[in-house]
Amino acid sequence: MRVVHVIESTATGTLAVVCTIANRLAAEGHEVQVIYSARDETPQNLHALFHPDVVLLNLQMKGPSLASTLLGLRRKLIELRPDIVHLHSSFAGFLGRLSTLFCLPSTAFLYSPHCISFIRRDVGRMKRYCFAALELLACVKSCTYVGCSESECAAIQRYLGRPAVLIENAVDRTVTARRDWNSDRSHSKTMQRIVTVGGIRVQKNPRLFAEIASSFNQDGTEFVWIGDGDPDLKRMLEEAGVRVTGWLARTEVIDAVAQADIFLSTASWEGMPISVIEAMTLGTPVVASDCPGNIDTVRHGSTGAIYHSALEARMLLKRIMDDDVFRNALTRQAREEARDRFSEDRFFNNVALLYAAKLKGIRQRVPA
């Protein structure tokens, strides 16, 4: 089977998902290509993240000319003639479908938005419907939507009137192999470290992170933002006493989350956050905002804590710091659930079965 992944957002959770699928496919002997765009936050060691047999092809998708980008992507996909094209993130999903109109009839197309655009909470209803209109335009090309959470699938059905196949995200084996790290650490120390991971952008709500950080005594609590992004928002975080690390190598991110006392998500919207799943798997208790994606991942009071305001977040953080019984219960239940629900094997098996079903359906409709 020849599979091509198209990814414009080549960083963080979306990249982690593509790596997992591509590497497992390549290890099983399938032919895998990844067409990607490089961003400022794209890891410098990108090639090292993939199986040696995965072929990486650079194509900058946010160039000066949309027409030239569409034509370039069309030419590349026709040249590769894949059995499966899997599009990742909204922009790649839009380009990938429009660029292949009236070609590749024997290819099955799948599209994983990884947090579809009309889930956004920073825009009004009219703009969300504009996003939906663009999605409907791209739907001229037959393609299977793959949602990563119940919230995302529900949004696709609501705005587009189309079903989506639910395949929840997962973490790769480099994380699950180290899930006992955090349980061995002492949490009675004087300095508590609270971390988050991601780009410094509106979606991750750094203003809320700064507000929560400012409410704590900096002598006893350290807030860390692992990532980089908007300079003004970064400055605001630093003025609130937050340490911003910049982009780190994946192994360094895993180390930092594993050694943290609490993982704090302040996101305003998510698909299904890989960083939260990784924290759960590593045994770092999670305190997360009540946004789409987070509420699909964390079960309040069982596998983590969900808050509705900065004040409630502070109260939950303090309780986890002060109440070892509560903390240990959250950690234990989160790790147990993550081991099965968010396992790489479960995720890849679901993806592989979907690929096989869609390819079989295409071949039955299109004569060889």
Question: What is each of the regions a protein language model found here?
Answer:
Residues 285-288:
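Short hydrophobic beta-strand element within catalytic cores of glycosyltransferases
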Residues 15-20, 196-215, 225:
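A conserved mid-protein helix/loop that constitutes part of the nucleotide-sugar donor-binding site
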Residues 5-67, 155-157, 166, 229-231:
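N-terminal strand-loop element at the rim of the active site
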Residues 87-93, 113:
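Short His-centered aromatic/hydrophobic patch
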Residues 268:
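Aromatic "clamp/platform" in nucleotide-sugar-dependent glycosyltransferases that forms part
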Residues 128-145:
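Membrane-proximal helix-turn-helix segments that form the acceptor-binding/catalytic region
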Residues 300-311, 319-325:
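Conserved acidic donor-binding segment of nucleotide-sugar-dependent glycosyltransferases
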